[in-house]
Amino acid sequence: MLPGLRRLLQGPASACLLLTLLALPPVTPSCPMLCTCYSSPPTVSCQANNFSSVPLSLPPSTQRLFLQNNLIRSLRPGTFGPNLLTLWLFSNNLSTIYPGTFRHLQALEELDLGDNRHLRSLEPDTFQGLERLQSLHLYRCQLSSLPGNIFRGLVSLQYLYLQENSLLHLQDDLFADLANLSHLFLHGNRLRLLTEHVFRGLGSLDRLLLHGNRLQGVHRAAFHGLSRLTILYLFNNSLASLPGEALADLPALEFLRLNANPWACDCRARPLWAWFQRARVSSSDVTCATPPERQGRDLRTLRDTDFQACPPPTPTRPGSRARGNSSSNHLYGVAEAGAPPADPSTLYRDLPAEDSRGRQGGDAPTEDDYWGGYGGEDQRGEQTCPGAACQAPADSRGPVLSAGLRTPLLCLLLLAPHHL
């Protein structure tokens, strides 16, 4: 031992050193290599590091974990700690999520698995146990189907992003447990039909986006129970007709977009036309594609005399649902047998401002008002450092000495020159 150091450990200096050792904070898990960690709230940020797997030895106290823009291929049980509130894994190479991966993340509120182009299927129990999950992002993957109970038990879910997948069909009661869901994004898929009970259970739904699919038919009861829906997008599909009863089930509807569909303005259009005569909504144009003499006209501006040659409409009791011997064409409002199917249209992305017709009344909310808080997923997946995730939280501190360390270390600094 150096003579100077021996003198430092004797007398008053030894007491000072003891105070210093007692004031040292307990040892905590280190931050994973190439990651950045913050203490308040406990955050680990590891985005854009070309990781092929989730880093080992994540601090168990982590509440926010950002792993987006890496090369992670699979997720296994035991990888994540139970204190996680936010988990971002978008823009990776995920192809497999093993059963039980998220089972013990009972505090998790946001899970982003979007923009994983190799994620083609999910196990039925993938999200089991996530009872506090509020936001689930599965956009821009390659999902062609979803298990019937994939969302079972997600009773707190409010935002569900399923856009830009390859979904061909949605099972009845797929969303039955999502009583608190307010936003459902299904645009940019390959859906062809909306069945009778596909949206059953979504009593809190406010916004439903179905544009850019291949829809040819909507069951007359498909929207039954969506009493709070204010925004419905059905543009850029292959709809030639739409049952008026389907829209009559939407008493809170504010904004409706039906443009870029091959609308048939013959007798099949009368239920939809009749609904428009009663409804007060902000709507896009509904341009007629057939018959030739009405091509280019707006379905909403047709007159009662345009339907004089049509058979009288079948009366329907309020709240009744057609069943039994009714033809599926009538239930879905599609063309009768023998009519040529409409070609699926390409994804319609950017509507012109004049596409919406304003409601009556100067104080009515605009569509932009409703979308003010919506963060587009298209831009999010391209960010390498989204929002505050890449910055230290406002209340976090850098390498600043705690109050318990300042006095002992100051004592050592003052004594050291006299003993060395």
Curated annotation (Swiss-Prot):
Provide the topology term for how it sits in the membrane: Lipid-anchor; GPI-anchor
Region annotated Disordered sits at 286-390
Task: Give the lipid-moiety residues, type GPI-anchor amidated cysteine.
Answer: C390
Q: Does the keyword Glycoprotein apply?
A: yes
Which region ranges are annotated with the description Important for interaction with MAG?
Answer: 315-327
Expression across tissues is:
Detected in adult brain, in neocortex, hippocampus, striatum and dorsal root ganglion neurons, and in retina (at protein level). In brain, detected in cerebral cortex and hippocampus. Weak or no expression detected in the cerebellum, thalamus or striatum.
Q: Where is the LRRNT domain?
A: 31-60
Arranged from A to Z, the UniProt key words for this protein are: Cell membrane, Cell projection, Disulfide bond, Glycoprotein, GPI-anchor, Leucine-rich repeat, Lipoprotein, Membrane, Receptor, Repeat, Signal
Q: List the propeptide residues.
A: 391-420
Q: Note whether Aminoacyl-tRNA synthetase occurs among the keywords.
A: no
What's a Gene Ontology MF term here?
signaling receptor activity
Q: What is this protein called?
A: Reticulon-4 receptor-like 2
Species the sequence originates in = Rattus norvegicus
